[in-house]
Each structure stands twice: as structure tokens, then as C-alpha cells.
């Protein structure tokens, strides 16, 4: 009986797992610098006391703001056209989420972006489109039961205002498990702002 139990544990531990491109194996490294379109600000990840922060420098004054913690791996970062907001995608357990870091009253703050609702779900960003005044996120969502079993799949599209940070235009599209998995196997579509 012990041999069968050990074999089953070996089988579970060594079973191949799907490799989804939407859950990338690489992230943006600390020290990589991104300069805003107007050249006024730059941002890079820095570690302080074993925590990663968005280090946002005012290139005019040399002041650096470390008020926004980067809680996970950073998968995507791009400045918004207004140079007053940063659009990001971060790794989270079982997926990824969006984050908008923005300047308000000379301080940097942030909002985490996930599909709304209180139901148990996993979600991953599969698309980002940055416009002049908002950012559009597309998520692949898997709803799960408390025991961890999936029950349905959907895509969630939503917009985040770069001025007010209000989430709007939330649209849910039911999908099949196959379409959901296919969206995760493809490289996420990140559409930067048009120059």
C-alpha cells in the first residue's frame, strides 16, 4: 500500500502542467529604466529593505518617490501618453493583474486592476491597450468552486480612466475552456499608445 501511495505522489508531482504564455517565466528586472514621453519622469524597480518599489524620479528636480510598492514580479510597464501615469501588468498567484500608477497632487499613488466581483476566480491579463485618456485591460477568467474545481470561463474587458482612475465599461463574455486556454497560450497583446 505504501508503494502505491508513493507512486501516486510521484505521479502528481511529476505530471506535466500546461505552460501558458500569459504566465511568463521572465519579468522586468530591477534597474531597467523607463523614461516618460515628455522626459520629465523616469521609473525603475528598486529593492529597499527586501521589498521592491517603483522608484519614480523627477528628472527636473532629481527627487525620487518610493511610495508605491511593487508586490510581485513586473511583467509589463509602459508610460501613458500624458506622462502622469504608468500602466503595468504584475504576476499574482494563478495569473496576473493590472496596475495603474499615477501622479496626483505631486504624489504617486496606484490602483490595482482585476475583474470585479466577489466570486472565487483566477484571472490573467491577455491584452492591454493604452489610449490618450484611458487604458483597456482584457482578462481571461476562470471561476472556481471552493474546492478548486473550475466551473466556468469568461473574458472580462474593462477600461481605467487615467485621470480619475475609475473603472468603467466592464464587459463579460462567456467562453469555453478551450478558448480560455488558447488565450493563455498566446503571448499577451500589449498595444502601446500611438505616437
Residue map of PLM features:
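Beta-strand-rich domains and repeat architectures in extracellular enzymes and scaffolds
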Residues: 25-52
